[in-house]
Amino acid sequence: MPKKSFQRTERISVQIRRDLGAFVQAAVRDHGLPSMSVSDVEVTRDMAHAKVFVTALQAERSFEAVAGLKALARELRMQLAQTMRLRFVPELHFHYDDSLDRGERIDTLLRDLIPPADAEKDESG
């Protein structure tokens, strides 16, 4: 029985991410927020809360983006309630997803560690 509940939370997470993605894009246009996208949604087992992870296209404006979404959380939740067929829509908690920034930083570090192939040929030849 618990496995079924887990599958339901996954389905709801996917639906919230899809619907909220469209609402966030509209909020970006309407309220002048920095460009961002919804990268992931985690819903608690009791479906009372949802962590919404967003990625800002301009990392330096990420705090402004998350603050803007937190201010619009109630309005976004009401929009979700109109589109989703749930008795209770989870309370939305917005967080900045820094996984892209961390991945880029790791990629840069790895690139700095590995010498380019052209430099190796010049030294040996």
Curated annotation (Swiss-Prot):
Q: Name one Pfam family in it.
A: RBFA
- GO cellular component term, pick one: cytosol
- Provide the alphabetized UniProt keywords: Cytoplasm, Ribosome biogenesis
Q: Please give the Gene3D superfamilies that the UniProt record associates with this protein.
A: 3.30.300.20
Q: Cytoplasm: is it a keyword of this entry?
A: yes
Q: Which GO terms describe its molecular function?
A: ribosomal small subunit binding
| Entry coiled-coil feature ranges | none
Major subcellular location class:
cytoplasm
Q: Where are the transmembrane segments?
A: none
Q: Keyword Transferase, does the record have it?
A: no
Subcellular localization is given as:
Cytoplasm
| A GO BP annotation | maturation of SSU-rRNA
Do you know which PANTHER family this protein is assigned to?
Answer: RIBOSOME-BINDING FACTOR A, CHLOROPLASTIC-RELATED
- Tell me the function of this protein: One of several proteins that assist in the late maturation steps of the functional core of the 30S ribosomal subunit. Associates with free 30S ribosomal subunits (but not with 30S subunits that are part of 70S ribosomes or polysomes). Required for efficient processing of 16S rRNA. May interact with the 5'-terminal helix region of 16S rRNA.
Complex and partners: Monomer. Binds 30S ribosomal subunits, but not 50S ribosomal subunits or 70S ribosomes.
Annotated family: Belongs to the RbfA family.
Question: Know the name of this protein?
Answer: Ribosome-binding factor A
